A protein has these predicted regions:
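A charged, aromatic-enriched C-terminal amphipathic alpha-helix characteristic of glycosyltransferases
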Residues: 333-367
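C-terminal "capping" alpha-helix adjacent to the active site of nucleotide-linked donor transferases
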Residues: 317-338
Length: 368
């Protein structure tokens, strides 16, 4: 099997210091290659990019016209937002849409984030001063056979929003890919820097309610840090009120985020309202488990309690509010052996056959 891969809103590269978006791309490609697929990527290639042992890179501006002569079984499109920063033309991103339209074969859209549905790009182009460089018919998606593979278990809200070029949508547990791509780690709970840590972005304030519920207002003897692009001035003063504030850390790369989580006792996995509607469990759930964190779940978010199968883990790790969370963190701080045993039990509970997982992913692409 041979698949061409493009990414909306970002380049594809295998350099050091990648962000979450690029990590998602590389993880998907690792799933493909472990499942026996040969992968070529079409992207903007820079001289500084190092050669990857996962894929061959083609500079999209030079090679987009050759894609149909290379006998691909599918074109895979990874979700993202295309932005023209400062109004500048981004040829590589516009050519992604040309490839979607012109590819003579199966087009698969990978929907990790339910808010990153495939959108028409021409409305963002037609008023730009450089719009005359492009033909509308090459960019407006008219095909109706695009296959969506998504980690959203409830597809109805996606259908309600309308899926551009949709032929069919199918659930696959993409949220489990950190079990393949994150390196397992054992935390020394007697020497952690923080009791509770969360890595994330503001996401337009869509997680403000949950962030305040679980990371604000905790007792003074529970140390809390939020890091990423989160800042206190983003939060509503009225909603925060006089609650004790967490510390705010800096923005980091994906590797740096993992390194920080390895120095924390616990985290809480939360989600947007639309994540709840679509029953989309975050990749962070499995990533934090593999990294060794005690991983609490917002019970309102993962309402089916499908992360863990062990009833005792479900009982302890699903929390309704900051009161329950604080009580359980105190139990962990008081008995670090219990914390270590719990961290190991989490890993064992979520363990899967990785070869089978990747083979199932490739089979899903073939069958959809």
């Amino acid at each position: 099997v041979k698949i061409a891969v493009i990414k909306l809103g970002a380049r594809i590269h295998d350099n050091e210091g990648v962000g979450n978006s690029t990590n998602e791309v590389l993880s998907t490609i690792k799933m493909l290659t472990k499942g026996g697929v040969t992968v070529d990527v079409y992207t903007k290639v820079l001289k500084k990019d190092r050669l990857s042992d996962l894929f061959i890179s083609y500079n999209i501006e030079d090679e987009y016209g050759n894609i149909n002569s290379r006998d691909y079984d599918a074109l895979m499109v990874l979700n993202g937002n295309v932005n023209f920063f400062g109004g500048a033309e981004d040829k590589s991103q516009i050519l992604n849409y040309t490839l979607i339209n012109s590819f003579k074969g199966k087009v698969v859209y990978m929907l990790y984030d339910p808010l990153l549905l495939l959108k028409q790009l021409w409305p963002a182009i037609h008023n730009k001063e450089w719009a005359s460089n492009w033909n509308e018919k090459d960019i407006v998606i008219t095909r109706n056979d695009i296959k969506y593979i998504t980690q959203c278990k409830n597809l109805d809200p996606l259908y309600d929003k309308g899926l551009t070029g949709m032929g069919i949508a199918k659930y696959f547990p993409l949220e489990k890919f950190p079990l393949l791509t994150s390196e397992e780690y054992v935390i020394d709970f007697d020497n952690v820097e923080w009791d509770l840590r969360y890595a994330g972005t503001w996401r337009g304030g869509r997680r403000q309610r949950s962030l305040i519920e679980f990371f604000f207002g905790l007792p003074e003897d529970i140390s809390v840090q939020l890091f990423g692009n989160l800042k206190i001035d983003q939060f509503s003063e009225k909603k925060v009120s006089d609650l004790r504030l967490p510390e705010f850390g800096s923005s980091v790369t994906h590797e740096e985020a993992e390194a920080r989580l390895k120095k924390a006792l616990s985290t809480v996995v939360i989600g947007d309202e639309f994540y709840i509607k679509t029953n989309d469990v975050a990749q962070r759930s499995y990533e934090s488990i593999i990294l060794g964190n005690i991983t609490f779940m917002d019970s309102r978010y993962d309402y089916e309690k499908r992360i863990f199968s062990d009833p005792e883990l479900k009982k302890f790790l699903y929390v309704d509010d900051r009161i329950q969370l604080a009580d359980r963190i105190y139990q962990l701080k008081k008995d670090t052996k219990f914390a270590s045993d719990l961290a190991l039990a989490q890993k064992k509970d979520v363990a899967i056959d990785l070869d089978e997982y990747c083979n199932d992913f490739v089979r899903c692409i073939k069958e959809i």
